[in-house]
Every structure is written in C-alpha cells, then in structure tokens.
Amino acid sequence: AIEWISTSKYSTKERYEKEFDNNGKKSYQNYLERNIIERKLLELDSKLVKRTKVAVITGYGSQKYILQTMVKQHSFKHIEVDVDTVDAFQGSQKDIILYSTVRSSGNKYGIGFLKSEARINVAFSRARCLLIIVGDMKFLDNYKIRGNKFPEIIKYITESEGCRIIEK
C-alpha cells in the first residue's frame, strides 16, 4: 500500500524548504514534513500491537538530522525506527517506510536530485507493507521538469486500489 500525505494545502511559509550549507554543499530541511512524520510515527506506535520495523528516509542530510533528533525524543513501544538518507538505505528493507521529499519552494523547477530515478527506486521499493510519502504533491506534480517521475507516481497512487492521498 502507498499513502501520500500532501503538504500542498499548507501556507507557503509552513511548507517551503529551508536551505542550509552542509560542509560546502547545499542541503535542505522541511520542518512541516518533520512534524507530520512525528505525528504519523506516534499514530503508528499507538495503533500497532506487533513490533514493527519502520524507517524514515530522505534525500537530504540536513533533513535526516532533524528527523533523527525528533525520533530520539520518543520511546516507541511497538515500532523500531531507523532514520537515514536514501543513499545510505540502499539494500535495506523495513515493514513501513516514511519518505520525506523535503523540496517545496517558489522555484517550480527546484526539485534537485528528487528526479533521480535510482533514488526514487530505492525510496519506493524498500517497504514490505506500507510506503508513506510526505511532501508537497502539487509542487512535485510538474511534467515540465525533464526526467521528473513524480507525475507518474501521483497518477499511479490516485488510480490504484490500496493507495490513497491525504490532504489537510
């Protein structure tokens, strides 16, 4: 099953990424996505009865840092949570994957390496039971960006049984 929790209907101030310098490289954080993932993890922990392996993954080191910090603030009873970047997660699998897309801005072409097919493949093929995507669906649903796979992914989710889109 696939679930997309879209941030598109939040204000730009809330949903837009923040840019950081990470050892001379640009990196991005998105606190709205962090907060949504925190609520989702708490919800999963309260609903699940069997110990479940969960991973929270993102393409950005700065986002990984704020997600790890948040996860450390909780002691979950029923979920075992790992946080990592998509690149570091290659080869691993978990029952549930939460994927933070991070990118959302006034630059409608600014999706960076989110359009990398290899990264999308890793992010979307590691969940045994449930993939939860958290991000600005309207921003990523842009056919004009060459190589952008998100419009196809969004179409698949909207047309497939067992998949759903959640909006504010």
Regions of interest found by a model, annotated:
Residues K13-R15, Y65-I66, S92-K94, G106-G110, ...:
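Switch/connector loops and helix/strand junctions flanking conserved nucleotide-binding motifs
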